[in-house]
Amino acid sequence: MQKTSSTTKLVIFLVVLGLISYLASLYVDWLWFKSVNFPSVFSTILLNKIGLYVFIFLATALLFAFNLRLTRRHMGPVEEPVYDDEEGRVIYLDDEKTPWKEFLRGKSSRWLYLGISLFAAYLVSSVAVDNWIVVQQYINRVPFGTTDPIFNKDLGFYFFNLTFYKFAYGTLMMALILLIITLGSIYLINASTNLLFGNWRQFSFAKGHMATLLAAIFLLKAWGYKLAAYDILFSPAGIVYGATYSDIFARLLSYRILLLLSIIIAAVILANIFVKKFKWILISLGAWVLVAVLMGSVYPSLIQKLVVQPNEFNKEKPYIENAIKYTRQAYGLDRAENREFNIDYNLDISDPSHQSTIDNIRLWDWQPLRTTYKNLQQLRSYYVFDDVDIDRYTVDGEYRQLMLSVREIDQEELPQQAKTWINQRLMYTHGYGLVVSPVTEVAEEGFPQFFVKDIPPRFSTDLKIERPEIYFGEKTDNYVIVNTSQKEFDYPAGEKNVYTRYEGKDGIKIKSFARRLLFGWVLKDYKMLLSSDITNESQVLMNRNILDRVQKVAPYLSYDGDPYIVINDDGKLYWVLDAYTVSDKYPYSEPFDKQRNNYLRNSVKVICDAYTGKMNFYIADESDPIIKTYSRIFPQVYQPLSAMPEGLRSHLRYPVDMFSIQAQMYRTFHMTDPSVFYNKEDPWLIPNETVEDKQVKMEPYYLVMRLPEEENPEYILMMPFTPKSRANMVGWMCARMDGDNYGKMLVYNFPKQETIYGPEQIESRINQNTEIAQQLSLWDQRGSRVYRGNLLVIPMGNSVLYVEPLYLQAENNRLPELKRVIAAFENKVVMEPSLDTALLKLFGQNQRVESQQTGVVVTPGELPGATVAELAKSAREYYDRANQLLRDGDWAGYGENIKKLNETISRLEEAAKP
């Protein structure tokens, strides 16, 4: 007894401990949501979960309690003896040798049945509670305004209604199956002895009770077949995704027959209570199984082989049209405007209308640039450049495309002896600043030309940063405590450090020892209780990773994997995150991933302050019914895009992830003629390019350019296409993103009678160019690693220019340097030290190119014909820079420039040889 009592106490203690831990975590969540000004999100989610849980719990408990009460009432005492034992004693069913009889029918059985009811209710409600969002979507649903071609229902039915009905069906089916298993077990246990001795009188009510429940399951199954019939619109088995001929005329028919059979079986089961014709149940069940097998697989297969395949196109044409129409709608491809791009190759590179494009041709790829940033601007081991972003800014009055990378803190990179609790929680709390460089400009050493660099930030343009501290970012994961008596490390200044205090309002105030105890419990950090640096005014900053942060507020959205930083007009730093509404419920739409998602909208733009962590969610696509539904559920979360500050709106980008999916779909679904689609006469491909020394698929890239028939340069995201059977280019797609044109898509088609070089053909021509091949081989022999950058296809006027950067990296030095630019136009390929000289060599003696790369005007007379003179100039520059770095105490920079000076002198000696 003592052992049992101790075990019970231990179980109770563990349950209470778990409950306290859960409530403490819940309270901390509430404090966090309150601190970020989204308390309504917490309360909406919590109340909906509680409401759904309680409703299903009570409904399931009542269902079980009612049926168990009926069962108990109709299991009356059995008075007839069962057998005599060896000593002649008569044993009754309620004898001590059958104690379960009393357990099932006696006074204590009420507690048993109550426990069963509560446990079953717990199981069903626990499974169902996470579908609270499904219920709310159904309640707050918004119609699409478009109907499907088979059932003529608004598409919102499949997104909201059908999902809710399937949830209700699954929950009811689970409850009924659990109930019939429970009651069947009780009836069998209670009447086990009667079964052995042929006493069937106790089964009259049991058979009727179980028959009623079984009939209910078949009626519910009939509803399930009705719901399943709608799934043919998402069938992956046909010539296109969605319902095809065999689905309509075979599978849909099978669902309707099975629905009718399920109702008949339910009626037969109920009738058998009175008629006692058990064989009719067996016959109806046999017919049900037979129809399920024959109509579910055999009959559709016969229809496909005997009816469809001999005349496939005519039979499938309407469904091909459906697939084309609805796939284009689901990905917004139906809104893409098609234009002709008439090629003539009469490009005047000196035309002022092309200057903005030339000034913004991207020569820096993010991978080598990040390595360069790390080597030149990391400054301390605990700083990290996690990513390189690209965006456009107006700099000194000019529209420029820039590369930016945030200098975040990575506490894992602190020296081992510095990984103390104070350093990781109170002192090293934030990153500092960022680096900015233009996409085209290259310094003499082959390094980027910095617009913003160093700590504290130094500026060479009118860009300004007033708040460089990074408390929230992509690499920032752990929690910190700010406004303590311990100063926060801000940034290094020579041999000294500069310290600061957090001035933001974000964070949960400690306030009291009770809260400190609470946070110590939830965060599993007992040192919070012992630290004398923490005061009641201290704030806990949690969920500092920006993706985790926004997902906690809106977990039902999908987020782009590439947030980017923006320098706002006020000098503050903000993260921009693209959020998507994604679904697998768009009829006939081809899926884009393994989860069969086939609907995609970039419906939300999220702005997150890098200093305070404040989040704002803006609706970017007001035509999306899904985000309209969410905004009804969470009205305090979403704002119209017009409410976003203009300085931030000017930096909104069309997301690469979404554009990649759209381009992938457009490869096939640009064919809008059913016959062309069926015969696959004109499928397109995303071309390959050579990056480093590997063949990879091209990725969409951002450009500043003046589109054909447009007056001003603008920021676009583009992707070229090639036909499947050839390597030449057939067209290109772009997404616009400036001003009112944001989100508009254009597709430019090249004339079919013209042959325009595709990226793979240009790469092949580069490989076959003897001068380029010799130079690459020479670098390789000298121990330098050649890194070939992204090939850019750049439409200009009625022509196409191709540009590819080339980086060199010494074996003993992981610092990539941009050393050459390869450019191609029409039938000519050149490789030169800079973009401007490459363009001059391409376009001849009558052209004049002024490039932002060097900031000088280059004419044919300045081409590197006088090699010795140029090398002598470079040697003087390396020497002067080395002396300056020596005076500044930069020994690493001094050594690097002396090394390059020696290399230049060696080249001078070779060039001077007769």
Curated annotation (Swiss-Prot):
Keyword Cell membrane: yes
Pfam families to which the protein is assigned, alphabetical: UPF0182
Membrane topology: Multi-pass membrane protein
GO cellular component, one term: plasma membrane
Key word Membrane present: yes
Primary localization: membrane
Residue ranges of the TM segments: 10-30, 45-65, 115-135, 169-189, 214-234, 255-275, 280-300
Keywords: Cell membrane, Membrane, Transmembrane, Transmembrane helix
Compartments in which it is found: Cell membrane
Family (UniProt): Belongs to the UPF0182 family.
HAMAP family named among the record's database cross-references: UPF0182
Protein name in UniProt: UPF0182 protein Swol_1161
Organism of this sequence: Syntrophomonas wolfei subsp. wolfei (strain DSM 2245B / Goettingen)
Highest classification ranks of the organism: Bacteria, Bacillati, Bacillota, Clostridia, Eubacteriales
